[in-house]
Amino acid sequence: MHQDGISSMNQLGGLFVNGRPLPLDTRQQIVRLAVSGMRPCDISRILKVSNGCVSKILGRYYRTGVLEPKGIGGSKPRLATPPVVARIAQLKGECPALFAWEIQRQLCAEGLCTQDKTPSVSSINRVLRALQEDQGLPCTRLRSPAVLAPAVLTPHSGSETPRGTHPGTGHRNRTIFSPSQAEALEKEFQRGQYPDSVARGKLATATSLPEDTVRVWFSNRRAKWRRQEKLKWEMQLPGASQGLTVPRVAPGIISAQQSPGSVPTAALPALEPLGPSCYQLCWATAPERCLSDTPPKACLKPCWDCGSFLLPVIAPSCVDVAWPCLDASLAHHLIGGAGKATPTHFSHWP
């Protein structure tokens, strides 16, 4: 390393300065050697310049004929010049409801900016925020308005309300659609939620609306449709938030059929339907059922030993349920301390 902090050495032993282009004489040597027929890799070894640097310089020279380096340091040229900023402030002051992209289009239409040197939408928004802070205006005056809502209000002679401030309020104007316009837009939305540019153009002509307004209307209408569908789905699944998937069991489903030795249920009072979380599964088999080839039967029945009406116990002989590979210890755990029956034998079903 030579001259710390100034020069660095590449893998070929050549010195270079970080962040600075090659000197012009070195560039001229690269071009002369390339014109004489030398390959870039040989030029790289002779001049001790990296192969990538040689290839870039030659490629740019063959493409544009320019040998000098591009601009050194700095940033991109500022597009929001003082005249442009002043015009942006003037447009926003005259029409506070203007979008940033509308201001951008107006700047191009007036010839103040060329197509390739127009401030971006984010740059215009930054200018508006800076003007708002400098002038101390309320945030609603210079803020870029949100998208137009597809609101259907009273009929209006024009497609849009005149742009301007509401006296005494900081609210922006909304587009007002006549009933015929709203009906045409809604009918097209029912045919397809994503109309192409041709369909939007025809609809804009038929409704006397700007095509941008039609596009924004469809965007907002799709968002409204998604909200409605989500609400409809949530209304259909009231227990989805708790993760409940077992349906409620009405008292009439609870069977009074009993197995030998089970507690009689005829004297139990009628109960309101209980939630799915208020039922537990317990298995009980009588000795004679252990000899059968059919799975044990289960039924949902309220548990009266627990001191409440929340936890029902399963009594046999109600609902046929296949219970594979259940051993006695697991069955005893499922029955808990209910004391309804003591399983002693359990068969295994495939």
From Swiss-Prot:
UniProt xrefs under InterPro entries: HD, Homeobox_CS, Homeodomain-like_sf, PAIRED_DNA-bd_dom, Paired_dom, PAX_fam, WH-like_DNA-bd_sf
KW Electron transport (keyword) present: no
Keyword Nucleus set for record: yes
Entries under PROSITE patterns matching the protein: HOMEOBOX_1 (PS00027), HOMEOBOX_2 (PS50071), PAIRED_1 (PS00034), PAIRED_2 (PS51057)
Locations listed in the record: Nucleus
GO MF term set: DNA binding; DNA-binding transcription factor activity, RNA polymerase II-specific; RNA polymerase II cis-regulatory region sequence-specific DNA binding; sequence-specific double-stranded DNA binding
Chain positions covered by the region annotation Transcription repression: 278-350
Annotated spans, Disordered: 153-172
Region called RED subdomain, residue ranges: 83-131
Region annotation (PAI subdomain) ranges: 8-64
One GO term describing the cellular component: chromatin
Chief subcellular location: nucleus
DNA-binding region: 5-131, 170-229
Pfam family of the protein (one): Homeodomain
Alphabetical GO biological process terms: animal organ morphogenesis; brain development; forebrain development; regulation of transcription by RNA polymerase II; retina development in camera-type eye; sensory organ development; type B pancreatic cell differentiation
Keywords: Developmental protein, Diabetes mellitus, Differentiation, Disease variant, DNA-binding, Homeobox, Nucleus, Paired box, Repressor, Transcription, Transcription regulation
Disease: Type 2 diabetes mellitus: A multifactorial disorder of glucose homeostasis caused by a lack of sensitivity to insulin. Affected individuals usually have an obese body habitus and manifestations of a metabolic syndrome characterized by diabetes, insulin resistance, hypertension and hypertriglyceridemia. The disease results in long-term complications that affect the eyes, kidneys, nerves, and blood vessels.
Biological role stated in the UniProt entry: Plays an important role in the differentiation and development of pancreatic islet beta cells. Transcriptional repressor that binds to a common element in the glucagon, insulin and somatostatin promoters. Competes with PAX6 for this same promoter binding site. Isoform 2 appears to be a dominant negative form antagonizing PAX4 transcriptional activity.
Family: Belongs to the paired homeobox family.
Protein name per UniProt: Paired box protein Pax-4
UniProt gene name: PAX4
